[in-house]
Structure formats: structure tokens, C-alpha cells
Curated annotation (Swiss-Prot):
It comes from the Bacteria. The keyword Transferase does not apply. This is Uncharacterized PE family protein PE23. The chain crosses the membrane at residues 23-43, 155-175, 203-223, 230-250, 261-281, 284-304, 315-335, 347-367. SUPFAM superfamilies: PE/PPE dimer-like. Residues 1-92 form the PE domain. It is a multi-pass membrane protein. One of its GO terms (cellular component) is plasma membrane. The lineage of its organism: Bacteria, Bacillati, Actinomycetota, Actinomycetes, Mycobacteriales. It comes from Mycobacterium bovis (strain ATCC BAA-935 / AF2122/97). Keywords: Cell membrane, Membrane, Transmembrane, Transmembrane helix. Gene3D superfamilies: HP0062-like domain. Belongs to the mycobacterial PE family.
Length: 382
């Protein structure tokens, strides 16, 4: 192993640097674990949820790969530390052998025999069996340590290509799955785009038509309400006029009745006066005169009441006529409002039909988009 030169201190320093790098990487992965494994959905729809789950799955796979890399890194650092310790022990054994040789050589040249230490070693087989045995044991131990280090280093380096290939395969699989899902999602979006565009255009046209119908319906309803108010006002005015007409008719009837009663009283008085005139200044004549005069007074009162009733009737008739005219006007306005309402309903009906059709197309587009999102999620899961 003369071609191999190892400095244990530098190997231990490199192991410590690698451990520090691993600590920094572990802290970085731990800090990124929360935002990358639990990605918050941008919205509450199915597509946003599926996209968030895709990126969350990528984050979890990255954490799994990080854990595997951390385990390999720790094992590699431990192997470096073990190798440095083994080389240090081997160098110590070599130094001990050199010291023994340096001490025993002068003793052999001066005394002709080994030093006391070598004599003790030769006389005590249980302690090592002599200098040659000790050096041979140290050499064998150093060879075994070097071989152990080489084996451990080879065993540590051997999994690197396969681990790198496995990591590349996992990354390629993740990228391929993401590309396939993205391609399917893009295809689904392209397929759903015409439906969505068509549905959006139909929605706009239908909304404009429906808004036109609503705009026409609003003044029609206002006209109906106003006509209803005018109709109620005219009805109230007509009812008031009819009430006054009824009251005037009652007064007129009372006046006619009083006139008839007064005429009867006057006729009775005149009859009595005529019958009493035969006997002028007779007691019967004297009694008949007040009766005849009372009938004339009652007749005058009845005539006055009759005139008042006719006056009241003449005052009420214009109100009745105005109420009937207002009632006719209100009826015409009400009929016009009903016609406007029917026209607005007819204009709004096609808009509502188009709106329903656009809603169906939009629902179909959403269905296509949902199917595409489910397919993308299925590919990611598989």
C-alpha cells in the first residue's frame, strides 16, 4: 500500500464538513416540508384542488428522497470517521515498531544481545512472543485495518451508482407523470375551451335578451300599478258620487213625499173650505180656514225641500260623470299596462330559453373539465 497516502486529520475534517453540510440540508428540507407537502388550493373548485394535491405529492416524494439521501450521507460520514480511526491506529502501530527497532539496535551492537525490554518480551511468551512476533502482529493488524477500510470504502461507494440511477429513475418517473398529467389536463382544457367559449357567448346574449325583457317589464309593471291606483281613485270618486246621488235622490224623494202630503193636506183644507163655504162664517168654515192655510204652508215647505233636492242632484251629477270618466280612463290604462306586461313577457321568454340552453352547454363544459381533472389525478395517483 505504498502508493496510498492518507492523512487522518484531513479525513476527519472532511467528515465533519460533510456532517455540517448534511445538517444544513436537513434544516432546509425541514423548513420546506410544510409549504411543499401541504400546498394550499388556490380556490375551492376541483381543478385547483387537484393541482394542489399534485404539487403536494411532489413535495412528499422530495421529502422521502431527502430522508434516503440523509441516511446514505450519515453512513458515508461514519465510514470516513472509521477509516480515519483505523489509519490512525495503523500509524501508531508503525511508530511503535520503529521505536522498538531504534532501541534494540544499539543494545545489540553494544551488548551483543537485545535490550531488557526485548528480553522480557522473549522470556514472556504470554506478552507477545518476542519483538518479531509483536512487529508481525502489528503489521498483520495494520494490513487487516487497511483491508477493512478498503472493503468498507468499496461497500460505501458501490451503492452510489445504483442509488443515483434509482434517484434518476424516480425523478424521471415523477417528471413523466407530471408531463402526462399536464398533457392530459391541457388536452382537456383545449377540448373544454370551445364549450366554455360558446357557453360564455350564449350566456352573454341570453343575459342581454333577458335584461331587455326585464327592462321592458319594469315600466309595464309600473304602468299596471299606476293604472291600478288610478282605477281605485276613480272607483272611490265614482262611489262618492253615487253616494251623493243616492243622498240627493233620498232628499228628492222626501221632497216629493212632502209635496204629495202637503198637496193632500191642501186638498183636504180646500175641500173643507169648499164645503164650509156654503155656510159662510159658520163654525165649520172658521175651522177649515186654518187647516187650509196649514196645508198651503206645508206645501210651501215641501216645494222648498224639492228645490233643494234638485239643486243637490244637479251638484252631484258632474261628480258622478267625472267619476265614470276617470273610471273609464283607469280601465284603459290598466288594459294598456296588461298589454305591456304581456309584451315584455313575450320578449323575455326567448331570452330565458337561450339562457337555459347556454346553461346546459356551460354545464357540459364543466363536466368535460371535471372528467379531465379526474383523469389527471388518476394518472398522478397511479
Amino acid at each position: 500500500m505504498q502508493f496510498l497516502s492518507v492523512i487522518p486529520e484531513q479525513v476527519e475534517s472532511a467528515a465533519q464538513d460533510l456532517a455540517g453540510i448534511r445538517s444544513a440540508l436537513s434544516a432546509s428540507y425541514a423548513a420546506a416540508a410544510g409549504p411543499t407537502t401541504a400546498v394550499v388550493s388556490a380556490a375551492e373548485d376541483e381543478v385547483s384542488t387537484a393541482i394542489a394535491s399534485i404539487f403536494g405529492a411532489y413535495g412528499r416524494q422530495c421529502q422521502v428522497l431527502s430522508a434516503q439521501a440523509s441516511a446514505f450521507h450519515d453512513e458515508f460520514v461514519n465510514l470516513l470517521k472509521t477509516g480515519a480511526t483505523a489509519y490512525r491506529n495503523t500509524e501508531f502501530a508503525n511508530a511503535q515498531s520503529n521505536v522498538l527497532n531504534a532501541v534494540n539496535a544499539p543494545a545489540r551492537s553494544l551488548l551483543g544481545h537485545p535490550s531488557a525490554a526485548e528480553s522480557v518480551q522473549n522470556s514472556a511468551p504470554t506478552l507477545g512472543g518476542g519483538h518479531s512476533t509483536v512487529t508481525a502482529g502489528l503489521a498483520a493488524q495494520a494490513g487487516r485495518a487497511v483491508a477493512t477500510v478498503e472493503q468498507q470504502a468499496a461497500a460505501a461507494v458501490a451503492p452510489l451508482p445504483s442509488a443515483g440511477a434509482g434517484l434518476a429513475q424516480v425523478v424521471n418517473g415523477v417528471v413523466t407523470a407530471g408531463q402526462g398529467s399536464a398533457a392530459k389536463l391541457a388536452t382537456a382544457l383545449q377540448s373544454a375551451a370551445p364549450w366554455l367559449a360558446k357557453s360564455g357567448g350564449e350566456f352573454i346574449v341570453a343575459g342581454q335578451s333577458a335584461l331587455t325583457g326585464v327592462a321592458l317589464l319594469q315600466p309595464a309593471v309600473v304602468g299596471v300599478v299606476q293604472a291600478g291606483g288610478t282605477f281605485l281613485t276613480a272607483g272611490t270618486s265614482a262611489a262618492t258620487g253615487l253616494g251623493l246621488l243616492t243622498l240627493a235622490g233620498v232628499e228628492f224623494s222626501q221632497g216629493v213625499g212632502n209635496l204629495a202630503l202637503a198637496s193632500g193636506t191642501a186638498a183636504t183644507g180646500l175641500g173643507l173650505l169648499g164645503s164650509a163655504g156654503v155656510q159662510l162664517f159658520s163654525p165649520a168654515f172658521l175651522l177649515a180656514v186654518p187647516t187650509a192655510l196649514g196645508g198651503v204652508g206645508s206645501l210651501a215647505i215641501a216645494v222648498v225641500q224639492l228645490v233643494q233636492g234638485v239643486q243637490h242632484l244637479s251638484l252631484v251629477v258632474p261628480n258622478v260623470v267625472a267619476g265614470i270618466a276617470a273610471l273609464q280612463t283607469a280601465g284603459a290604462q290598466f288594459a294598456q299596462g296588461v298589454n305591456h306586461t304581456m309584451l315584455a313577457a313575450q320578449l323575455g321568454a326567448p331570452g330565458i330559453a337561450v339562457l337555459q340552453t347556454a346553461g346546459g352547454h356551460f354545464a357540459q363544459g364543466i363536466g368535460h373539465l371535471t372528467t379531465a381533472g379526474n383523469a389527471a389525478v388518476t394518472v398522478l395517483i397511479s
